[in-house]
């Protein structure tokens, strides 16, 4: 990672911006949503990515200590995925490493979705916290 930051420093213009966007190492929240209101939620544990985040944090700290970049700002946000069924969520998760490793109870989610919809249009919303940080090249 330090090599990647060194290369970013090399190619950035003076005072150019380095953007670091990654998920927070925290449980995802899966909700049953009707209209815009969550009517039920559960947390899904996923420790995949914790080592990646730690390595990235270490590399960033090294780059800051070498004064390659100056921290500018940090902005937390939620990334949300909407699915009509638990099977749709399962198909999406198969394509993404961090979600693939999460212990998502698909069958239980589908049962809960059917129970709570009661004829209304209900969807699953998977919400994960992310951080966008920016650093300026010195």
Name the predicted role of every residue range:
Residues 8, 20-22, 82-83, 93:
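Long, contiguous hydrophobic alpha-helical segments, chiefly transmembrane helices and signal peptides
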Residues 36, 61, 73:
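Localized chelating/binding microdomains
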Residues 32, 39, 59, 88, ...:
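Exposed alpha-helical structural elements
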Residues 17-51:
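Conserved class I S-adenosyl-L-methionine
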Residues 13, 21, 32-33, 50-62, ...:
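Conserved short hydrophobic patches within well-ordered secondary structure
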Residues 65-138:
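Conserved Class I S-adenosyl-L-methionine
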Residues 2-17:
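A short glycine-rich, Lys/Arg-flanked "PGG" loop and its adjoining helix->strand segment in the class I
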Residues 41-58, 75-81, 97-102:
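Acceptor-substrate binding/catalytic loop of class I
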């Amino acid at each position: 990672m330090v090599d990647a930051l060194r290369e970013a420093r090399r190619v950035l213009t003076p005072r150019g911006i380095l953007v670091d966007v990654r998920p927070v190492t925290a449980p995802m929240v899966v909700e049953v949503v009707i209209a815009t209101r969550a009517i039920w939620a559960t947390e899904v544990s996923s420790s995949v990515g914790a080592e990646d985040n730690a390595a990235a944090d270490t590399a960033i700290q090294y780059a800051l200590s070498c004064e390659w970049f100056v921290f500018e700002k940090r902005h937390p946000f939620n990334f949300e995925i909407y699915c009509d069924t638990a099977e749709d969520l399962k198909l999406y998760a198969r394509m993404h490493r961090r979600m693939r490793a999460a212990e998502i109870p698909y069958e239980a989610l589908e049962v809960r979705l059917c129970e709570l919809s009661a004829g209304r249009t209900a969807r699953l919303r998977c919400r994960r916290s992310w951080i966008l940080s920016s650093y300026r090249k010195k």
